[in-house]
Amino acid sequence: MQVTETLSEGLKHEFQVSVPAADLDAKADAKLVDLKDKVRINGFRPGKVPVAHLKKIYGKSVMAETIDQTIRDTNTQIFTERGFRLATEPKVTMPTEEAEVEKILSGQSDLTYTVAVEVVPAITLADFKTFSVEKPVADITDADVDEAIKRLADANRSYAAKAEGAKAESGDRVKVNFKGTIDGVAFDGGTGEGIDVVIGSNTFIPGFEDQLIGIGVGETRTLKVAFPKNYLNNDLAGKDAEFETTATAIETPEEKVVDDEFAKTLGLESLDKLKQLMRDRLAGEFNQATRQRVKRALLDRLDETHKFDAPPSLIDEEFNLMWNSVKAEMDSSGKTFADENTTEEKAKEEYRTIADRRVRLGLVLSEIGEKNKITVTDDEVSRAVIERARSMPGREKEVWDFYRSNPQALAQLRAPIYEDKVVDFILELANVTEKKVSKDELFKDDENDKAA
């Protein structure tokens, strides 16, 4: 066997490989000898079929299998000897001319092919003990707890019928019957009876609720609205519609008193128990926000300290995933790049930079995990599947079966677990200091989150 490197540019390598016909023929003959004891051919006793006869019948198919296995074994040897860590699947180019292929399959010609591959660069890891990471922490105040309970009370408030002749106001709940049309034609899903609409809740399409202000019981109005351009039903998105709407009842919200009795309606012993429950929930939310901030800061530090050329094909793959998502979202919403105060060229440049960062960070985290023997156990993955199933009540078995039969989906669950374990490993070594911040500062949006 002869191996010649024909290309070595950065992370890209290409080799021309030549395997003598005699070597292939010997391997194929060995397969045929093994096959002799397994096949049944009329006129021959089991195990007594001459190899030469088998070669006439199965020779080309066995040679094809031999070539396939030889290429895989040879490529593995080439990459192992050179210490390559592959970034992509090897791209093998075989002879295509029919006459040449026939000679190779017949054992009359050497096999010559090329294999191109892109490799992962050698990564020198930083000393994580030199990392300083700020951990923002916000205190949960009594006002935060009271605000959370008020939101809960508002969501559970009851309504009482308004006085006869009273008109609907913002905040009222109006029971309506409606029939929607587009250009005078009714459409699927456009009809409803006994539907409760809380004016100002913004749960219906824009303009629908506002036009109910001032309506009375028994009154019919024609509400003129436009479906949003990003409406889920593409057949309705962006279209003008009219809803012939009749109010059958109008109710006003009753003030919900937050006391022990309210807590009992939620299955709790007292208001104090409710406050403790809400404080615990807020603690979970605050801790999660802190975790995200710390993780983002750590990833920024890893980005700063690990600058290298990432495999172009991986960057292209990551960019294409993001760009296709961006384009689909913009097409759905009807927005243009001008609406975002940018151009398509600038947006592409920005997302390619993000793709490069994501690929590099992925390689760095993988290198850290590999060198420190960080793994994800089957139990950890199973717990993640169980949590996902619990988040979809009534569909638990469907979710469980989906992940059991879908290795790719299971890998997508495993990846964030692995990433978090690597992050925790680094944080154990880094110098992490707490910083008191306000709730608003802790939960503020970070414009750069998409780069994480």
Swiss-Prot record:
GO CC terms, sorted: cytoplasm
Enzyme category, top tier: isomerase
GO MF annotation, one: peptidyl-prolyl cis-trans isomerase activity
Domain PPIase FKBP-type, chain residue ranges per copy: 171-256
Gene3D superfamilies in UniProt: 3.10.50.40, Trigger factor ribosome-binding domain, Trigger factor, C-terminal domain
SUPFAM superfamilies: FKBP-like, Triger factor/SurA peptide-binding domain-like, Trigger factor ribosome-binding domain
Main location: cytoplasm
One Pfam family recorded for the sequence: Trigger_C
GO biological process: 'de novo' cotranslational protein folding; cell division; chaperone-mediated protein folding; protein transport; protein unfolding
Catalytic reaction(s) noted: [protein]-peptidylproline (omega=180) = [protein]-peptidylproline (omega=0)
UniProt keyword annotations, A-Z: Cell cycle, Cell division, Chaperone, Cytoplasm, Isomerase, Rotamase
EC identifiers of the protein: 5.2.1.8
UniProt note: domains: Consists of 3 domains; the N-terminus binds the ribosome, the middle domain has PPIase activity, while the C-terminus has intrinsic chaperone activity on its own.
NCBIfam families: tig
PANTHER family with a match to the protein in the record: TRIGGER FACTOR CHAPERONE AND PEPTIDYL-PROLYL CIS/TRANS ISOMERASE (PTHR30560), TRIGGER FACTOR-LIKE PROTEIN TIG, CHLOROPLASTIC (PTHR30560:SF3)
UniProt similarity note: Belongs to the FKBP-type PPIase family. Tig subfamily.
Name of the protein: Trigger factor
This protein's encoding gene: tig
